[in-house]
């Protein structure tokens, strides 16, 4: 068996220690005497595969699942090129074919051969593993299923060419690495340069879940569709009353356009200084990125908005075509102004410049979408719609009466208040 250490493109895996240990055991299979005394290493490998199954939700042939996990996560010159254009031409194909030949040998290896050396059925068990938990601590079910399905295809490949075609198709269709497997990310500024890490537990909110606000949703959809389709689009500011669905709309947009290559990176004010590092990492990838800032506003003493202005406008470098900024805020003017500011501006020789500097951030957002609080009739319509969706059985008159009482005690008229009321009723009914 050719050693994994001879790979050119696919090497230095993040979780490659298990791969090295397993391939060493396989390479030594023709020299049984060498394997004696390595029982601990063998059982440690089985242990790691089972632990990975618990973490990632893998089932079936855990060895194949693990190998597939390595391949779909490895970002190299070949995989990232396939992500953009699909099949590629040139010398790099020869290197990829060589590496896939090695991996095909790993897929084709019969783990039961190891049972001849180590008297146990562990190898057989991990080739038909029944997972007690269908969930995953790292992936959602959709991602886990894609990896397991690809593992089955690769195991059935009759040739290295077919093996390679399956990998190229996966890279083109779903992408490679964390950007290909995940929808949303947060910024980790504890390392230099800052990096993005996946958010694994995403709320499955859809735009249709948001009752009303059809004009606002259409404006958001039109801009986002233009963006994912490669047409000119604008940065978006969603502003208005609290609890009106601004943040839910962003989550809905992500879930609606994820399959078309949309990804979201969540950023907070203290991370604005890291945005240039993040943009540099994603600007050449085959995805559309929305940098999402929730509940954005600035006090008069906060200067982070200047970082944001610089990022939006860009410097000498051309602004990437695959990045937009979407923000939500309860304020139309993001930088707070007070009446006392007028007194201070009397001593400012260029007071109009000072005012314009504070207003200029909003002007960077080409599309502003207003979400206003519903009136009483709209609120009641939201309640009735949500009650029907959640199969709340209650006479309409009683439902609306209780909803009116609820909103008076819990924050007033808003979609959030309506949802909280319905959640209360559902929880109450389940306890009966």
What is each of the regions a protein language model found here?
Residues 1-211:
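AAA+ P-loop ATPase mechanoenzymes
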Residues 202-236:
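Pre-Walker A (pre-P-loop) alpha-helix and adjacent loop at the N terminus of AAA/AAA+ ATPase modules
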Residues 235-267, 277-283:
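Walker A/P-loop
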Residues 280, 284, 299-349, 353:
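Conserved catalytic/switch belt of AAA+ P-loop NTPases
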Residues 294-296:
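Walker B catalytic acidic pair
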Residues 329, 346-359, 366-380:
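Conserved AAA+ ATPase "SRH/arginine-finger" region at the nucleotide-binding site
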Residues 368, 372-432:
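C-terminal alpha-helical "lid" subdomain
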């Amino acid at each position: 068996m050719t050693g994994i250490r001879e790979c050119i493109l696919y090497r230095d895996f993040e979780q490659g220690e298990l791969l090295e240990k397993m391939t060493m055991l396989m390479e030594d299979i023709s020299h049984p005497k060498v394997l004696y005394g390595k029982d601990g290493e063998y059982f440690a490998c089985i242990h790691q595969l089972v632990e990975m199954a618990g973490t990632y939700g893998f089932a079936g042939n855990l060895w194949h699942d693990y190998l597939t996990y390595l391949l779909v996560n490895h970002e190299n010159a070949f995989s990232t090129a396939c992500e953009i254009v699909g099949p590629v031409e040139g010398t790099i194909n020869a290197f990829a074919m060589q590496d896939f030949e090695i991996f095909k040998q790993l897929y084709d290896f019969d783990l039961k051969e190891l049972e001849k050396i180590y008297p146990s059925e562990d190898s057989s068990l991990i080739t038909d593993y029944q997972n007690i938990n269908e969930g995953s601590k790292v992936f959602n079910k959709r991602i886990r299923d894609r990896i397991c399905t690809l593992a089955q295809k690769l195991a059935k490949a009759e040739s290295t060419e077919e093996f390679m075609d399956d990998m190229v198709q996966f890279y083109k269709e779903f992408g490679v690495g964390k950007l290909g497997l995940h929808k949303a990310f947060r910024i980790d500024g504890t390392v230099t340069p800052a990096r993005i890490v996946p958010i694994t537990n995403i709320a499955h909110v859809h735009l249709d879940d948001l009752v009303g606000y059809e004009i606002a949703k259409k404006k958001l959809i039109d801009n986002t569709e233009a963006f994912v389709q490669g047409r000119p689009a604008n940065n978006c500011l969603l502003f208005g009353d609290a609890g009106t669905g601004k943040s839910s709309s962003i989550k809905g947009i992500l879930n609606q356009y994820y399959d078309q290559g949309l990804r979201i990176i969540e950023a907070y004010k203290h991370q604005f200084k890291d945005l240039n590092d993040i943009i540099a990492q994603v600007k050449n990838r085959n995805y559309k990125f929305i940098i999402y800032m929730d509940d954005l506003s600035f006090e008069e003493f906060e200067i982070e908005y200047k970082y944001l202005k610089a990022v939006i406008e860009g410097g000498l470098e051309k602004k990437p075509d695959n990045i937009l900024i979407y923000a939500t805020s309860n304020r139309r003017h993001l930088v707070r102004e007070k009446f006392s500011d007028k007194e201070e501006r009397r001593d400012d020789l260029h007071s109009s410049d000072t005012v314009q500097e504070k207003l200029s951030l909003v002007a960077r957002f080409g599309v502003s979408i207003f979400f206003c609080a519903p009136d009483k009739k709209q609120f009641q319509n939201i309640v009735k719609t949500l009650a029907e969706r959640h199969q709340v059985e209650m006479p309409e008159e009683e439902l609306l009466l209780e909803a009116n009482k609820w909103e008076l005690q819990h924050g007033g008229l808003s979609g959030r208040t309506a949802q909280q009321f319905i959640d209360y009723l559902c929880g109450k009914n389940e306890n009966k």
